[in-house]
Amino acid sequence: MMPVRPAESSQCTLNYVAPRWLPGGQLQTIWPALYSRRVKGPAWTTPDADFLDVDYLQDGAPTEFLRPLLVVFHGLEGSSRSHYGEAFADVARERGWACALPHFRGCSGEINRAPRAYHSGDHEEMGWMLERLRRAHRGPLMAVGVSLGGNALLRWAAEAGAQAGRSVDAV
């Protein structure tokens, strides 16, 4: 395993200003849960003959996209219907990006066939998902994870080391 190097840091000089019609943290948290758009997508067959569901923003598959693709990994017991997943999808839409929201096993609403569950250290399956997305997408690919999804993504990046750049352009 390669040693983890600290990322270059830069000071953010922008201050967040909430829209007048959406003041306060509570309303900003509730808004995406109430008004975000839903996405749908196909199931992928895994190497162990199970399946993973991946939801895409708009067109159903990223193959024709040259624009950036944002991949959002959900938290514990989350899904593409989690308010934060829909909020990320809305941001991607506003920026003209594609967005993919893969479900970890058992989180898409359907019971999986294989007796395998997801966990925060499952970096192999995370790598498989990212490699499959990279093969299908020609544009820049960025990955983000929320809570457990962030932990699994960073574990994958640490395990992959310099090879991570073959699958993603940014984590």
Predicted regions: what they are:
Residues G24-T63:
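N-terminal cap/lid segment of alpha/beta-hydrolase-fold proteins
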Residues D59-R113, W128, R132:
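Short, surface-exposed "cap/lid" segments of acyl-processing enzymes
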Residues E77-S80, Y118, V144-G145:
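Short amphipathic alpha-helical molecular recognition features
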Residues R116-A136:
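Alpha/beta-hydrolase active-site loop
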Residues V54, L70-V71, C99, M126, ...:
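Structural signal for hydrophobic/aromatic residues that build the beta-strand cores
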Residues M1-S36:
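N-terminal presequences and immediately downstream first alpha-helices
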Residues T46-D50, R81, H119-H123:
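Phosphate/oxyanion-binding active-site loops and adjacent basic polyanion-contact surfaces
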Residues M129-V171:
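Primarily recognizes the serine-hydrolase "nucleophile elbow" in alpha/beta-hydrolase
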